[in-house]
From Swiss-Prot:
Gene: rpsB
Gene3D superfamilies reported in the protein's UniProt record: Glucose-6-phosphate isomerase like protein, domain 1, Helix hairpin bin
Pfam family membership, one: Ribosomal_S2
Family under the similarity heading: Belongs to the universal ribosomal protein uS2 family.
InterPro entries in UniProt: Ribosomal_uS2 (IPR001865), Ribosomal_uS2_bac/mit/plastid (IPR005706), Ribosomal_uS2_CS (IPR018130), Ribosomal_uS2_flav_dom_sf (IPR023591)
Protein's UniProt name: Small ribosomal subunit protein uS2
One GO process term, biological-process aspect: translation
PROSITE patterns: RIBOSOMAL_S2_1, RIBOSOMAL_S2_2
Chain intervals for the UniProt region annotation (Disordered): 226-267
Highest taxon of the lineage: Bacteria
Organism of this sequence: Xanthomonas oryzae pv. oryzae (strain KACC10331 / KXO85)
Gene Ontology MF annotations: structural constituent of ribosome
GO cellular component annotations of the record: cytosolic small ribosomal subunit
Length: 267
């Protein structure tokens, strides 16, 4: 799969951490030093961890799994939405709704309501209502779409979550950990990398850095999908195998006019 280089990370500002006074001790192994009271992240540590995380995302996509892209902070919203849509994965870019994972059944009911309102707006139902009713329903639809539009096709819990800022998305990460859902996340110098399954030490604020992470994640997903076995060919192979097994257990019928072998005479 395409690998992100150290030069690309340097150009995107991935190596710039937070102010030294806000650092988390568990990030010490990933910190190269400090410059002007700002911690500098050791990209020699980041690059292999980043590529490992991307390989993991690709492996999930290859198994036809679902990865939820999560980035609700202002600097992450546009990139997360764009790249998630590009690779066909669900996303959340507005405020995380508590219980999105742990109370998924209720969330699915809200998604069903959103789809119902979208259908009503296009099938002529709204045309039969008075103006104030239409305005009320449209406001409801817009509110639901803003919070749940990115996950309306996510019919089950995701197989993993890709997160930009673990401090900003702490509730989502707690829900994922409670349910045993793997978390792949960018972790800046001010947070604990041990809170996630695949930590990517790096700047979680710079727009260019976020674009790099999101684009690479989407590329990994697309590559995994491309490597997934074709369902039609899998069924064809299974059918061929079953036919071969059945053929082994059958005896070819005797040709016309050919006598069957006589049974051995009893002694």
């Amino acid at each position: 799969m395409p690998q992100v280089t150290m030069r690309q990370m340097l150009e995107a500002g991935v190596h710039f951490g937070h102010q030294c006074r806000y650092w988390h001790p568990n990030m010490a192994q990933y910190i190269f030093g400090a410059r002007g009271k700002i911690h500098i992240i050791n990209l020699e540590k980041t690059v292999p961890l980043f590529n490992d995380a991307m390989n993991y995302l690709s492996s999930i996509a290859q198994k036809r799994g679902t990865i939820l892209f999560l980035g609700t902070k202002r600097s992450a919203r546009a990139s997360i939405k764009e790249e998630a849509e590009r690779c066909g994965m669900p996303f959340m870019t507005q405020r995380w709704l508590g219980g999105t994972l742990t109370n998924f059944r209720t969330v699915k009911q809200s998604v069903a309501r959103l789809k119902e309102l979208e259908a009503a707006e296009t099938d002529g139902t709204f045309d039969k209502l008075v103006k104030h009713e239409v305005l009320s329903l449209r406001r409801e639809r817009e509110k639901l779409d803003a919070s749940l539009g990115g996950i309306k096709e996510m019919n089950r819990l995701p197989d993993a979550i890709f997160v930009i800022d673990i401090g900003h998305e702490d509730i989502a990460i707690k829900e994922a950990k409670k349910l045993g859902i793997p978390v792949i996340a960018v972790v800046d110098t001010n947070y604990n990398p041990n809170l996630v399954d695949y930590a990517i030490p790096g700047n979680d604020d710079a727009i260019r850095a976020v674009q790099l992470y999101a684009r690479a994640a989407a590329d990994a997903v697309l590559e995994g999908k491309a490597a997934a076995p074709n369902s039609a060919s899998v069924r064809e192979e299974e059918f061929s195998a079953e036919s071969a097994d059945e053929g082994k257990g059958r005896r070819a019928p005797a040709k016309k006019g050919e006598k069957k072998a006589d049974a051995p005479a009893a002694e």
